[in-house]
Amino acid sequence: LLVQLERMCNPQMISKVHNSKNEKIKEFEKLVENYFKQYKMPSFYADKLHVTANYLNKICKTETDKTAGDIIRKRITIEAQRLLHYTNLSVNEIAHDLGFDNVSYFITFFKKQVQTTPEQFRKLANQ
């Protein structure tokens, strides 16, 4: 029992576990970058990483203080803001480009994330 406790408290072992979590987070962030337009659910990314959605959320929360869903939504929001600010694409085109089948759902999503509509954001960003 003492040997097991010593192994569990071994700083090298703790470091390996921490590094493993960091690697999973890095892999997750790469996957989000590649797939955020098509896949918005953490379960897709968890499957790709060969972990459960609950475990993915746990390591995200531990390492970044955000859930996996928060990280995905943040990436979608950043891309929406970039497209609104730097392109002349319509809100409908941006919604479609970001994988939203319904423009009104995109507007609701955007407003919840940014506290303003896409059109209002564009006007403010381009002043």
Predicted feature residues:
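Helix-turn-helix DNA-binding elements, focusing on the entry/boundary residues of the two helices
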Residues: 42, 53, 91
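Alpha-helical residues within helix-turn-helix
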Residues: 43-44, 93, 120
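Short hydrophobic/aromatic patch on the recognition helix
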Residues: 56, 105-106, 110
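Terminal helix-turn-helix DNA-binding modules in bacterial transcription factors
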Residues: 62-107, 123-127
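Residues within the alpha-helical elements of helix-turn-helix
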Residues: 48, 97-98, 113
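Conserved amphipathic alpha-helical interaction elements at protein-protein interfaces in regulatory
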Residues: 7, 11, 34, 38, ...
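Core structural elements
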Residues: 1-3
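Short, Lys/Arg-enriched, Trp-marked, Pro/Gly-tolerant hinge/linker segments that flank
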Residues: 5-30, 34-48, 62-70, 74
